[in-house]
Amino acid sequence: AERIKNWNIEKIYCSDLKRAMETAAIINETLNVNIVVESQLREIDFGEMTGHSDEENAKYFAFFQKKLKSRRCDLAYPGGECGADVYQRGFPVINKIVHGSTGNVAIVTHGGFIRCMLAGILGMDFAKKSMFGKNMENTSITELDYDTDSEMFTLERFNDYTHLEGKPELLRSSWK
């Protein structure tokens, strides 16, 4: 919150998943603006892989993960979503937020969702979304600028977590 307190954020939008709502509430202790919860900002649905450790998923879904890493096609997670599904679900709310705002907004969401939105917004094949990295740091900042004249987005910042410097316990690499 300290990092963005001077960015003139007019509203916070967040996913309806618990961790996103908790993060939005923490940010709002500093910003004191309205929070709007949008279910369409949820993380990609990992289907049958949800709730399992990376090790379990590597063991039980090895064939799927190998195909996913090939980046040849946009695969749906077993029983879940593919990148295009997430984009079709999420972009309408992003569009509504952009066109319904007069200033800066913060969107608190999830790494998989962000990668899918970026792939779609930047015109990439959804199979290539993993080019944005396997994991994003929690509380990292990805910044898009929307130009109303050209109706185009520009990626200004991606997975920026410099505000976590000096706090290694908060980084993914410290998780056991």
Annotate the PLM regions.
Residues 14-15, 88, 108-109:
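Short beta-strand scaffold positions
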Residues 1-33, 37:
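Active-site-proximal alpha-helix that buttresses catalytic centers in soluble enzyme cores
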Residues 19-21, 43-45, 113-115:
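Short, active-site-adjacent cap segments at secondary-structure transitions
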Residues 9, 101-102:
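Short, high-confidence coil segments that cap the C-terminus of an alpha-helix
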Residues 33, 44-56, 119-176:
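Acidic, low-complexity terminal tails and accessory targeting/binding regions
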Residues 102-108:
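Residue-level preference for the first positions of well-ordered beta-strands
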Residues 29-91, 154, 175-176:
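Phosphate-handling substructures
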Residues 3, 30, 96, 100, ...:
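Active-site catalytic microenvironments for nucleophilic, acid-base chemistry
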